[in-house]
Amino acid sequence: MGRTIVVTGGSSGIGRAIAAVFAAAGDRVFITGRTERTIVAAAKELDASHSGEVIAVVCDSTRPRDLAKLVDEVDEHVDVLVNASGGLVAGKPCDDPLEELSETWSAYIAQNVLGAVLTTAALRELLGPRSTIISIGSIGAERRGGAYGAAKAALAAWSAGLSAELGPQGVTANVVSPGYITGTDFFQGGMTDARHELLVGETHDKRPGTPEDVAELVFFLASPGARHITGQTIHVNGGAFTTR
Protein backbone atom coordinates (compact mmCIF):
# COMPACT_ATOMS: atom_id res chain seq x y z
CA MET A 1 0.00 0.00 0.00
CA GLY A 2 1.34 3.43 -0.96
CA ARG A 3 2.02 6.31 1.37
CA THR A 4 -0.10 9.41 1.86
CA ILE A 5 1.55 12.59 0.61
CA VAL A 6 0.42 16.22 0.86
CA VAL A 7 1.99 18.75 -1.52
CA THR A 8 0.96 22.40 -1.26
CA GLY A 9 1.29 24.47 -4.41
CA GLY A 10 1.02 21.32 -6.49
CA SER A 11 -0.58 22.66 -9.65
CA SER A 12 2.59 23.71 -11.48
CA GLY A 13 6.37 23.94 -11.48
CA ILE A 14 8.28 22.40 -8.60
CA GLY A 15 5.18 21.42 -6.64
CA ARG A 16 3.71 19.56 -9.59
CA ALA A 17 6.99 17.75 -10.29
CA ILE A 18 7.12 16.66 -6.65
CA ALA A 19 3.56 15.37 -6.81
CA ALA A 20 4.41 13.48 -10.01
CA VAL A 21 7.41 11.64 -8.57
CA PHE A 22 5.40 10.40 -5.60
CA ALA A 23 2.41 9.46 -7.78
CA ALA A 24 4.75 7.52 -10.07
CA ALA A 25 5.81 5.48 -7.04
CA GLY A 26 2.20 4.52 -6.37
CA ASP A 27 1.62 6.89 -3.47
CA ARG A 28 -1.66 8.67 -2.76
CA VAL A 29 -1.01 12.36 -3.29
CA PHE A 30 -3.11 15.33 -2.22
CA ILE A 31 -2.17 18.52 -4.06
CA THR A 32 -3.40 21.95 -3.02
CA GLY A 33 -3.76 25.26 -4.80
CA ARG A 34 -5.79 28.43 -4.54
CA THR A 35 -7.40 28.30 -7.99
CA GLU A 36 -9.92 25.50 -8.47
CA ARG A 37 -9.61 25.26 -12.24
CA THR A 38 -5.83 24.85 -12.28
CA ILE A 39 -5.50 22.52 -9.30
CA VAL A 40 -8.30 20.23 -10.50
CA ALA A 41 -6.83 20.08 -14.01
CA ALA A 42 -3.37 19.27 -12.64
CA ALA A 43 -4.74 16.48 -10.45
CA LYS A 44 -6.63 14.92 -13.35
CA GLU A 45 -3.57 14.97 -15.59
CA LEU A 46 -1.27 13.54 -12.91
CA ASP A 47 -3.79 10.91 -11.86
CA ALA A 48 -4.26 9.74 -15.44
CA SER A 49 -0.55 9.38 -16.14
CA HIS A 50 0.71 7.74 -12.92
CA SER A 51 -0.12 4.67 -10.86
CA GLY A 52 -0.78 6.59 -7.65
CA GLU A 53 -4.02 8.44 -6.94
CA VAL A 54 -3.82 12.25 -7.13
CA ILE A 55 -6.49 14.31 -5.39
CA ALA A 56 -7.05 18.06 -5.75
CA VAL A 57 -7.90 20.21 -2.75
CA VAL A 58 -8.66 23.90 -3.21
CA CYS A 59 -6.78 25.50 -0.35
CA ASP A 60 -4.99 28.76 0.42
CA SER A 61 -2.31 27.76 2.91
CA THR A 62 -2.51 31.13 4.65
CA ARG A 63 -6.21 30.71 5.52
CA PRO A 64 -7.06 28.61 8.59
CA ARG A 65 -10.57 27.83 7.31
CA ASP A 66 -9.15 26.39 4.10
CA LEU A 67 -6.67 24.32 6.10
CA ALA A 68 -9.46 22.91 8.26
CA LYS A 69 -11.09 21.67 5.06
CA LEU A 70 -7.77 20.16 3.95
CA VAL A 71 -7.51 18.22 7.21
CA ASP A 72 -11.06 16.91 6.76
CA GLU A 73 -10.26 15.89 3.18
CA VAL A 74 -7.06 14.02 4.05
CA ASP A 75 -8.36 12.52 7.32
CA GLU A 76 -5.63 9.88 7.61
CA HIS A 77 -2.01 9.46 8.61
CA VAL A 78 0.26 11.74 6.55
CA ASP A 79 3.61 10.19 5.67
CA VAL A 80 5.06 13.17 3.82
CA LEU A 81 4.17 16.87 3.90
CA VAL A 82 5.79 19.06 1.26
CA ASN A 83 5.36 22.81 1.75
CA ALA A 84 5.91 23.91 -1.85
CA SER A 85 3.57 26.89 -2.11
CA GLY A 86 5.04 30.40 -2.11
CA GLY A 87 6.95 32.58 -4.53
CA LEU A 88 6.94 36.16 -5.66
CA VAL A 89 4.14 38.51 -4.67
CA ALA A 90 2.64 41.19 -6.90
CA GLY A 91 2.76 44.46 -4.98
CA LYS A 92 -0.23 46.76 -4.70
CA PRO A 93 0.44 50.42 -5.55
CA CYS A 94 -0.20 52.74 -2.62
CA ASP A 95 0.08 56.49 -2.12
CA ASP A 96 1.92 55.97 1.15
CA PRO A 97 5.37 54.40 0.51
CA LEU A 98 5.62 53.00 4.03
CA GLU A 99 2.16 51.48 3.79
CA GLU A 100 3.10 49.90 0.46
CA LEU A 101 6.35 48.54 1.93
CA SER A 102 4.49 47.13 4.91
CA GLU A 103 1.93 45.38 2.72
CA THR A 104 4.61 43.97 0.42
CA TRP A 105 6.69 42.50 3.23
CA SER A 106 3.62 41.14 5.00
CA ALA A 107 2.53 39.43 1.79
CA TYR A 108 5.95 37.82 1.25
CA ILE A 109 6.05 36.54 4.82
CA ALA A 110 2.50 35.20 4.54
CA GLN A 111 3.08 33.37 1.25
CA ASN A 112 6.55 32.01 1.97
CA VAL A 113 6.61 31.38 5.73
CA LEU A 114 3.19 31.61 7.35
CA GLY A 115 1.58 29.23 4.86
CA ALA A 116 4.08 26.50 5.70
CA VAL A 117 3.77 27.14 9.44
CA LEU A 118 -0.03 26.99 9.37
CA THR A 119 -0.22 23.97 7.08
CA THR A 120 2.20 22.02 9.25
CA ALA A 121 0.31 22.97 12.42
CA ALA A 122 -3.01 21.99 10.85
CA LEU A 123 -1.73 18.55 9.83
CA ARG A 124 0.36 17.99 12.96
CA GLU A 125 -1.98 15.41 14.48
CA LEU A 126 -1.91 13.40 11.24
CA LEU A 127 1.89 13.10 11.32
CA GLY A 128 3.56 10.29 13.21
CA PRO A 129 6.80 8.35 13.64
CA ARG A 130 8.68 8.15 10.32
CA SER A 131 6.73 11.06 8.82
CA THR A 132 8.74 13.78 7.13
CA ILE A 133 8.21 17.49 6.46
CA ILE A 134 10.02 19.08 3.53
CA SER A 135 9.75 22.79 2.80
CA ILE A 136 10.91 24.45 -0.41
CA GLY A 137 13.30 27.30 0.25
CA SER A 138 15.43 29.35 -2.15
CA ILE A 139 18.96 30.38 -2.99
CA GLY A 140 17.57 33.88 -2.40
CA ALA A 141 17.85 33.24 1.34
CA GLU A 142 21.64 33.22 0.94
CA ARG A 143 21.89 36.28 -1.28
CA ARG A 144 20.46 39.75 -1.77
CA GLY A 145 16.92 38.42 -1.92
CA GLY A 146 15.01 41.34 -0.42
CA ALA A 147 11.66 40.49 1.14
CA TYR A 148 11.51 37.16 -0.68
CA GLY A 149 14.98 36.11 0.46
CA ALA A 150 14.27 37.20 4.02
CA ALA A 151 11.08 35.15 4.04
CA LYS A 152 12.88 32.05 2.76
CA ALA A 153 15.62 32.54 5.37
CA ALA A 154 12.91 32.65 8.03
CA LEU A 155 11.45 29.45 6.58
CA ALA A 156 14.79 27.69 7.04
CA ALA A 157 15.11 28.91 10.64
CA TRP A 158 11.58 27.73 11.42
CA SER A 159 12.24 24.33 9.83
CA ALA A 160 15.38 23.82 11.91
CA GLY A 161 13.39 24.52 15.07
CA LEU A 162 10.65 22.19 13.86
CA SER A 163 13.21 19.42 13.45
CA ALA A 164 14.32 19.82 17.06
CA GLU A 165 10.72 19.91 18.27
CA LEU A 166 9.45 16.88 16.37
CA GLY A 167 12.62 14.80 16.18
CA PRO A 168 11.93 12.95 19.44
CA GLN A 169 8.64 11.77 17.89
CA GLY A 170 10.47 10.36 14.87
CA VAL A 171 9.52 13.16 12.46
CA THR A 172 12.18 14.72 10.23
CA ALA A 173 12.08 18.26 8.84
CA ASN A 174 14.31 19.69 6.12
CA VAL A 175 14.45 22.49 3.58
CA VAL A 176 15.28 21.94 -0.08
CA SER A 177 16.67 25.17 -1.50
CA PRO A 178 16.63 25.50 -5.31
CA GLY A 179 18.62 27.91 -7.42
CA TYR A 180 17.68 28.86 -10.98
CA ILE A 181 14.95 26.43 -12.07
CA THR A 182 13.40 26.56 -15.53
CA GLY A 183 9.77 25.66 -16.16
CA THR A 184 8.50 27.55 -13.11
CA ASP A 185 6.27 30.60 -12.79
CA PHE A 186 8.95 32.21 -10.63
CA PHE A 187 11.46 32.51 -13.47
CA GLN A 188 9.23 32.66 -16.54
CA GLY A 189 7.94 36.21 -16.13
CA GLY A 190 10.90 38.55 -16.56
CA MET A 191 13.64 36.19 -17.72
CA THR A 192 15.78 37.73 -20.47
CA ASP A 193 18.42 35.90 -22.49
CA ALA A 194 21.12 37.89 -20.71
CA ARG A 195 19.75 37.00 -17.28
CA HIS A 196 19.48 33.34 -18.28
CA GLU A 197 23.10 33.28 -19.41
CA LEU A 198 24.23 34.98 -16.21
CA LEU A 199 22.44 32.50 -13.95
CA VAL A 200 23.61 29.48 -15.94
CA GLY A 201 27.14 30.89 -15.92
CA GLU A 202 27.14 30.89 -12.11
CA THR A 203 26.60 27.13 -11.99
CA HIS A 204 29.40 24.58 -12.08
CA ASP A 205 27.58 22.26 -14.47
CA LYS A 206 26.58 25.11 -16.80
CA ARG A 207 22.89 24.34 -17.00
CA PRO A 208 19.73 25.53 -15.31
CA GLY A 209 17.97 23.27 -12.86
CA THR A 210 14.65 21.61 -13.60
CA PRO A 211 11.65 20.95 -11.36
CA GLU A 212 12.55 17.26 -11.59
CA ASP A 213 15.99 17.95 -10.06
CA VAL A 214 14.23 19.29 -6.98
CA ALA A 215 11.57 16.59 -6.96
CA GLU A 216 14.11 13.75 -6.95
CA LEU A 217 15.86 15.17 -3.89
CA VAL A 218 12.54 15.62 -2.10
CA PHE A 219 11.67 12.01 -2.92
CA PHE A 220 14.98 10.82 -1.45
CA LEU A 221 14.49 12.84 1.74
CA ALA A 222 11.16 11.06 2.17
CA SER A 223 12.80 7.63 1.78
CA PRO A 224 13.99 5.21 4.49
CA GLY A 225 17.58 6.01 3.52
CA ALA A 226 17.20 9.60 4.71
CA ARG A 227 15.85 8.99 8.23
CA HIS A 228 18.97 10.45 9.88
CA ILE A 229 18.88 13.62 7.77
CA THR A 230 16.95 16.34 9.59
CA GLY A 231 17.28 20.01 10.49
CA GLN A 232 19.13 20.68 7.24
CA THR A 233 18.92 23.07 4.30
CA ILE A 234 20.02 21.18 1.20
CA HIS A 235 20.87 23.17 -1.91
CA VAL A 236 19.97 22.25 -5.49
CA ASN A 237 21.68 24.89 -7.61
CA GLY A 238 24.43 23.28 -9.67
CA GLY A 239 27.09 24.93 -7.52
CA ALA A 240 25.84 28.50 -7.95
CA PHE A 241 25.94 28.72 -4.15
CA THR A 242 28.30 26.41 -2.28
CA THR A 243 28.56 25.40 1.36
CA ARG A 244 31.21 23.61 3.39
Predicted regions and their residues:
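Conserved mid-core segment of classical short-chain dehydrogenase/reductases
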Residues: 72, 87-106, 147, 188-191
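Conserved glycine-rich cofactor-binding loop
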Residues: 11-13, 35
